[in-house]
Structures are given as C-alpha cells and as structure tokens.
Amino acid sequence: MSGVCLLIDAGNSRIKWALADTGRHFVTSGAFEHADDTPDWSTLPAPRGAWISNVAGDAAAARIDALIDAHWPALPRTVVRACAAQCGVTNGYAEPARLGSDRWAGLIGAHAAFPGEHLLIATFGTATTLEALRADGRFTGGLIAPGWALMMRSLGMHTAQLPTVSIDAATSLLDELAANDAHAPFAIDTPHALSAGCLQAQAGLIERAWRDLEKAWKAPVRLVLSGGAADAIVRALTVPHTRHDTLVLTGLALIAHSA
C-alpha cells in the first residue's frame, strides 16, 4: 500500500515517532517528553494511517489522539497489541496478548534487523527488559527489572540516608570515578557508590542472562542493546554487544506494511 505511515512509540518516559515510507525507511523522526509541548507536525506529509504502541496509559493515549486530530482528524489509527504470531515472530508468552506492545514490536524489529541469529534484546528504559529470541523467530521468554534511574530513585525514596541521584548526576559521578583508577571499581563516597552499584546491577543482570542463554541454547547469541540508558550501561559491560535504538519503531513499520 502506498503512502507514508506514522509510527508512535509511547513509553513511560517519552514518546518517539517516525514517518516510514513504503520501503520501511524513516523519512523523519523525533521524540518528546510527556510533559513537553506537542511537536509541530504541520509540515509533514499526510500519512495513510498511524500505528501506535502505547505502554504509558490513558493520558498518553488521549494526548496522542489529540495530536493526531490537530493535523489529520480522519486518520485511521491502529493500536498495536501483541498476538500469537506476526511478521515472522512467534510469541512464547503463556498469554500472548499480555506481552507489552513495545516489547512485541521490538522483537519484530530485532528479528528483521538480525535475520538468522539468536538474540538477547536488552532495552533500558523506566524498566530494563530482556527478551530471548531464537533465530527462527520464536520468542521464548524474558525478564523485567527496574531500570537504572528507577533503582537509584527507589533507594533515595525508601531509605533514610541515601540520596536520590538522577541519571545525569550519576553519569557525571561515574565519569569522575572512571578518571580515578585507584578507586575503581569501588567508590569512596555514597553518591558515587549508589550510582556505580546500580549500574553494575544492570550490567550484571545482562551479562548473566547472556551467558546463561548461550549455555542453554549451545549456540552464539547476539546481545542487542536499546533504550535511553544504554549509553551509560554500555560502559559497565564486558561482553560483546550491538546497539540498535529504533527496534520498536522498526517493528511498527513492519506491522504497518504487513497490514
């Protein structure tokens, strides 16, 4: 079907969007925070439809609808949901529909991006999610843990003496820690220790899962990283990995063009 497709990935922290052409190439793209002003789409070509992954709830859904209505009120919209099988990926969840739409679209995007390879997909957002995807497209299961920022924020909120450290502050603290080899990898004050400890928890989860998966499958597994906190977590990883930051939008493009 001709015409560009509007793709929207509404996560808990921000909303990413793109226009994809018939070749599934992104014509233009962007992102905005939930609290930010709405983006200006007035100069965009009219899409043939919108494909939406929304894990951020009803308020985000209403905002997305209002944004689309302001530019193309009659635009058809498809709210993507996980299903048993789609675009070459088979859903291994006990109840396939309960898998998050972002994880489902990301699996589809990853399978297309790395055909014929076993994959462990690690996405770093509000939550850190892991998906095990076999080369034949079978999603065999996953893990969900608090994201790096959520870990640090939870410690600050639920302890009497630990500070609340933001990602920006933690990144600066880790830069300082890395510059002082005499103290790495251990910190000598609380903010540095909290930042590094939560980062190492993320890296340890990923590396343990990757090694366990290679052992279970008795085959090489490509570790694919995505998400806003990936830049920081990469610095703590000691295993081979590949970055791909548009897995969900890529998966949405595939879903749209299969419709």
Swiss-Prot record:
Reactions mediated catalytically: (R)-pantothenate + ATP = (R)-4'-phosphopantothenate + ADP + H(+)
One of the record's GO cellular component terms: cytoplasm
Active site: D102 (proton acceptor)
GO BP terms, alphabetized: coenzyme A biosynthetic process
Localization: Cytoplasm
EC identifiers of the protein: 2.7.1.33
Function text: Catalyzes the phosphorylation of pantothenate (Pan), the first step in CoA biosynthesis.
PANTHER family, alphabetized: TYPE III PANTOTHENATE KINASE
Protein name: Type III pantothenate kinase
Organism (species): Burkholderia thailandensis (strain ATCC 700388 / DSM 13276 / CCUG 48851 / CIP 106301 / E264)
